[in-house]
Swiss-Prot record:
It catalyses: a quinone + NADH + 5 H(+)(in) = a quinol + NAD(+) + 4 H(+)(out). NDH-1 shuttles electrons from NADH, via FMN and iron-sulfur (Fe-S) centers, to quinones in the respiratory chain. The immediate electron acceptor for the enzyme in this species is believed to be ubiquinone. Couples the redox reaction to proton translocation (for every two electrons transferred, four hydrogen ions are translocated across the cytoplasmic membrane), and thus conserves the redox energy in a proton gradient. It is found in: Cell inner membrane. NDH-1 is composed of 14 different subunits. Subunits NuoB, C, D, E, F, and G constitute the peripheral sector of the complex. Its EC number is 7.1.1.-. InterPro entries: NADH_Q_OxRdtase_suD, NDH1_su_D/H, NiFe-Hase_large. This is NADH-quinone oxidoreductase subunit D. HAMAP family: NDH1_NuoD. Belongs to the complex I 49 kDa subunit family. SUPFAM superfamilies: HydB/Nqo4-like (SSF56762).
Amino acid sequence: MQQPNKLTPFFENLNFERDDNTMVINFGPQHPSAHGQLRLVLELEGEQVVKAYPDIGYLHRGIEKMAENMTYNEFLPTTDRLDYIASTANNYAYALAVEKLLGIEAPRRAQVIRTMLLEINRLISHLFFIATHALDVGAMSVFLYAFREREFGMDLMEDYCGARLTHSAVRIGGVPLDLPNGWIEKMISWCDKVDHELEHTYNALLQENRIWKMRLEDVGVISAEDALSWGCTGPMLRGSGVNWDIRKEEPYELYGELDFDIPVSDRCDSYGRYRLYMEEMHQSTRILRQLVSKYKESEPQLMAHAPQYISAPKEEIMTQNYALMQHFVLVTQGMRPPKGEVYVPTESPKGELGFYIKSEGEPYAYRLKCRAPSFFHTGLLQEILVGTYIADVVTIIGSTNIVFGEVDR
């Protein structure tokens, strides 16, 4: 019987007991600074890294295959479990791809609410990055302050949808709920607090901190050419001097109507990326303030009108026979998009997050592919870690801001 060819990682047969001066160690997958289930096989000469092999797959759940066996609406909550630090960004990217496939557009008010939720999630994710990155380097106090501000953002999400981490706050065709009473005032108050704390607390603790700068400056240098060739996006790409943001280049929702800047750093190191994240948070609060007036001007319609794909409002389902029958069919059998394929990119807090969907006219996707930014940034580690010291490995991993829910999928 012919033996099938087995594809094995090229580090599987590494000899950990060497006679020369090199040493091979495992970093992770249980290491607290691995930012998830990351295993790094590091080959060292003294304290200097000469080779680095990222080993992924410890969190693989077969999410893309699950999409082929679930209706389009059933699959949406599963996207929460990709980048679980900013789950609404995943919900939205998937919903937008399905909407493009269906040829529908969310109502104006739903677009305003979605944009608000996306920027709140961007702030939550960036605060989490600052907190964990500072903790990795040893700045414990910044971790506590950043988690305090993040908690208020999670409270806003809980007030809106009832969930704090995995939100499922977006629907295909719109949003399920209008904003609660007093929610906008809480959001503006939070934005004011975030801006104040960024300027007077985080900058005071970090920006000119001698130890912080020594740990980050000229560490994890990524040239613009390397960033582009490895497929980097988001802050990892803009931190290398490349001005590219999907919200500006291919605007979606209301981003084309909003006035905001795209921070870019030409330092190309970990310190430049840290400064870029700080400035992006200021831009997110700026966007949120602009959305308040647009919300008040919009009509209170939350879901697109497309009876063949989307259920009618609850009031119509309870009073109209046709709406009830259509709702029953959509729930039990699922919507049937037309045949075709679509890829839609969005700007998640970590970079370009896009979904490719191929439809054969059935209630289930024939193929779904998630283009997650953390996957590409993890691959980059095998290049930027070479030549650095073992003490800087944690700093570099932290500055890439990878989350393994969207790496392994």
